[in-house]
From Swiss-Prot:
GO cellular component, as recorded: mitochondrial outer membrane
Record keywords, A-Z: Membrane, Mitochondrion, Mitochondrion outer membrane, Transit peptide
Biological source species: Candida glabrata (strain ATCC 2001 / BCRC 20586 / JCM 3761 / NBRC 0622 / NRRL Y-65 / CBS 138)
A Gene Ontology biological process term: import into nucleus
Gene that this sequence comes from: FMP52
Main location: mitochondrion
Similarity annotation: Belongs to the FMP52 family.
Protein's name in the database: Protein FMP52, mitochondrial
UniProt subcellular location: Mitochondrion outer membrane
Source organism phylogeny: Eukaryota, Fungi, Dikarya, Ascomycota, Saccharomycotina
Membrane topology type: Peripheral membrane protein
Length: 233
């Protein structure tokens, strides 16, 4: 496969940061773009597009023919100011940018979702995640990869803190890569989500298929992809 161009959304968050770092570090990509509300000081070798007005992001997508879109674009209910506003970012903005990317010739999309995502869930968050997955799949990208991490571990630059989150992370760290990790649904590091997302995208892009493909990657497979990548590096 010749060297490609990729776009990363949500790089100010934990998973997005590591998707961007993994894409930049990969020899598969000649150029990597990020679109965000603020600049990203932790990575230099990418084309940063910064605009606080996310409603203009679709028009800011690269005009060149990019084949890969990685998105972990998301917020919290508290940060957004309510669930309806969270939905506008997590669902509506993701869908708008995915549609625009496909119109620009993008073939492979990697979406960071969540374990338990289900459009029929009684929990608003998991129902929203399930609706995002369904609507992204309906766009019929050549390859759709949906990452469903469980407990997310790692340092967050967005200060997504609080007693509940801190406690969950502490418990997740206790089970991380232990014999009992399945009890917590296989906790993963944000870095591992980034590595797995890029590796899964490259694997799918190598497949010569005529019909659109959809691949779900849960936490246990995320760990397997990371181990295989490190063993072969």
């Amino acid at each position: 496969m010749s060297k490609q161009t990729a776009v990363v959304l949500g790089a100010t968050g934990l998973c997005g940061e590591h998707l961007l770092k993994s894409a930049v570090a990969s020899q598969a990509f000649e150029k990597v773009y990020s679109i965000s509300r603020r600049s990203l000081p932790y990575v230099a070798d990418c084309e940063q597009i910064v605009d606080k007005d996310s409603s203009s992001w679709a028009s800011l997508l690269p005009k060149e023919n990019f084949k890969f879109l990685f998105t972990s674009l998301a917020t919290t209910r508290a940060a957004a100011g309510g669930f309806d506003k969270q939905y506008q970012i997590d669902h509506d903005l993701n869908l708008e940018l995915a549609k625009a990317s496909k119109a620009n010739g993008c073939e492979t999309i990697v979406l960071v979702s969540s374990t338990g995502a289900n459009k029929n869930s009684w929990m608003p968050y998991l129902r929203m995640k399930g609706e995002i997955e369904e609507d992204i799949i309906a766009l019929n990208f050549k390859h759709t990869i949906i990452l469903r991490p469980s407990a997310l571990l790692g340092d967050r630059r967005d200060h997504h803190k609080g007693f509940g989150n801190d406690l969950f992370v502490k418990i997740g760290n206790c089970f991380y890569r232990s014999r009992l990790q399945s009890i917590m649904g296989y906790p993963v590091q944000g870095e591992e989500v980034g590595i797995a997302g890029v590796q899964a995208a490259l694997q799918e892009a190598e497949k010569n298929t005529e019909s659109p493909t959809v691949r779900y990657v849960g936490s246990s497979e995320i760990l397997e992809l990371v181990d295989n990548f490190k063993n072969n590096s």
